[in-house]
């Protein structure tokens, strides 16, 4: 919508400028011819010349109206021609660029894209590798940072009771095969005499009854 209006305005200005230049030139030429005409008439009517013969009429001098018309035409034509020429020169000089939101947004987009590409293409920073002496004297902490230590339930218990429980529960070694076999032999040895004594007691009671 704005582009057709701009084209119409520039076309109208160029047409008006052309008309002013042409009309000023025509009026100036007409005034110059009028000036030359009455100047020639004044030259023919100068006193001191010989009187013409009686059969030829004496030419009359130019009227004051013709002089005023010639002066007005010369002045107006020169003014119009000067304005038209100055306007043409001013129009031919390129002015400052007009603000265009489309071009401005496009320039900003290209600017941001170029700046991001330049930042991505930058060389990485060079890290100084420490020497052996620096590494020994200033050890570098490796690994992730340790989380803050929070008190647990075990830490909240009194240390005295925990030590007492540990002292009352001796650490027994795990049973071996030899210890298990010895325990079984001892149990079998204890049960065998009692069984024989009970059997002999039953035999004696049976004999006494008979």
UniProtKB/Swiss-Prot annotation:
The chain crosses the membrane at residues 18-38, 69-89. It is found in: Membrane. It comes from the Eukaryota. Keywords: Membrane, Transmembrane, Transmembrane helix. Residues 140-172 are annotated as: Disordered. GO terms for cellular component: membrane. The keyword Transmembrane helix applies. InterPro entries: TMEM61 (IPR028164). Its main location: membrane. It holds the Pfam family TMEM61. It is a multi-pass membrane protein. PANTHER family: TRANSMEMBRANE PROTEIN 61. This is Transmembrane protein 61.
């Amino acid at each position: 919508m704005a582009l057709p209006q701009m084209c119409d305005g520039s076309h109208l200005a160029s047409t008006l400028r052309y008309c002013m230049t042409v009309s000023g030139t025509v009026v100036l030429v007409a005034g110059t011819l009028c000036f030359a005409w009455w100047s020639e008439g004044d030259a023919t009517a100068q006193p001191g010349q010989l009187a013409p013969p009686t059969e030829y009429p004496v030419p009359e001098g130019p009227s004051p109206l013709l002089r005023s018309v010639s002066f007005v035409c010369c002045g107006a034509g020169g003014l119009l021609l000067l304005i038209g020429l100055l306007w043409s020169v001013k129009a031919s000089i390129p002015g400052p660029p007009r603000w265009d939101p489309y071009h401005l947004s496009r320039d900003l987009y290209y600017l941001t894209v170029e700046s991001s590409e330049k930042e991505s293409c930058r060389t990485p920073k060079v890290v100084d590798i420490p020497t052996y002496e620096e590494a020994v004297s200033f050890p570098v902490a490796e690994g992730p940072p340790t989380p803050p230590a929070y008190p647990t339930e075990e830490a909240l218990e009194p240390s005295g009771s925990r030590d007492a429980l540990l002292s009352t529960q001796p650490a027994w070694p795990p049973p071996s095969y030899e210890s298990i076999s010895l325990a079984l032999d001892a149990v079998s040895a204890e049960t065998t005499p009692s069984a024989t004594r009970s059997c002999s007691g039953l035999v004696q009671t049976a004999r006494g009854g008979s």
